[in-house]
Amino acid sequence: MNITTILPQTRKAYSLIHQMTGDLGGNSHGGAIYGEITMVSMQKIVQLMKRHTKLGPGSRFIDVGCGLSKPNIHVALDPGVEFSYGIEMDVNRWILGMNNLKICLDEAIGKGQSKQNEQFLHRCILEHGNIESAKNFDPFTHVYMFDVGFPPKLLNKLSEIYNRSQSKYLICYHGEKDMIEKYGFDIELIVKVKTNMHGSRRSHTVFIYRRVSTKKNENIDLITCNGMPCDDLFHDAWIKTKKGDLQSIHEGIKQQIMIARQTSEPKRTNLQYKDLVQKPSLSLRSKIKKKKNGKSSLPLLTTKRHLQFIQKVLVTSQMLIFVHCYP
């Protein structure tokens, strides 16, 4: 297979995500991470992981800071990993990612896709949480993180978590000098490749590493799932992929999105919320064509357009939140 050969179901998923959130990346909502990886670049990474790290149906994949959920959905479809898990600490980006997963599940259910594709999507779980709560990365075989913009304090913590794990592979965007010498990850480089990003239009090099040693978890109370070590933070999600069916997963996602929308702005009145939805930012207003009578038309935003609007207007506030969390 050519390194950039992309499966039809993967192309369809990216098309649906584009309809929901456009080309803008994770930073478009205001985070400190600039851009979201393109479909072609992610496919290159997937093919390299297949070739060099045995990524396949038996693999378990985690995306630390999953943002809009593209890598998670991608590997759930190709190669159809056993468990695709994403964790995001920013509630707004998590909601965007959940909406992206929801529309892919909508398509799978509504269009009557094959049971195999439904099963692949059913293995994808996104959670709102803090990765620093984990003691290790078990049961994941592949740890992926778009760590451009991660503060040193967080990378030091992730090094401790990874070194206590049995996870075999680490995929990230920092070179050997930083990851091994500065942050102390017990890894060695396998391969690296250039990638392109949406939003920022920047290119970044992704580095694929393998573990060189495994430290014993002498001071950690391990729990197991399916006979494998599993950190408590990931246990329930993994069980959910084993026991839940597609319909129950789909309904659960819809309920989580609804609850998150209701609780993310607890102090906003219905009138204020209506005003926010109806009025775009000044930069957007300038792009709206005026009617013949000279008055601007400010159309009511749909759910999809509201999500895009959220991405555009909270840049400054979200960067302040990020700095506060990781000084």
Which positions does each model-derived feature cover?
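S-adenosyl-L-methionine
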Residues: M1-G58, I95-D138
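Conserved class I S-adenosyl-L-methionine
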Residues: P57-G67
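Conserved SAM-binding loop of SAM-dependent methyltransferases across substrates and taxa
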Residues: K70-V81
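Conserved SAM-binding motif I beta-strand of class I
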Residues: F83-E88
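A short SAM/SAH-binding and catalytic strip from SAM-dependent methyltransferases
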Residues: E132, F140-K153
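C-terminal substrate-binding/active-site "lid" region of AdoMet-derived donor-dependent transferases
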Residues: F150-E218
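Long, low-complexity, Ser/Pro/Thr- and acidic-rich intrinsically disordered regulatory regions
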Residues: Y209-S317, P327
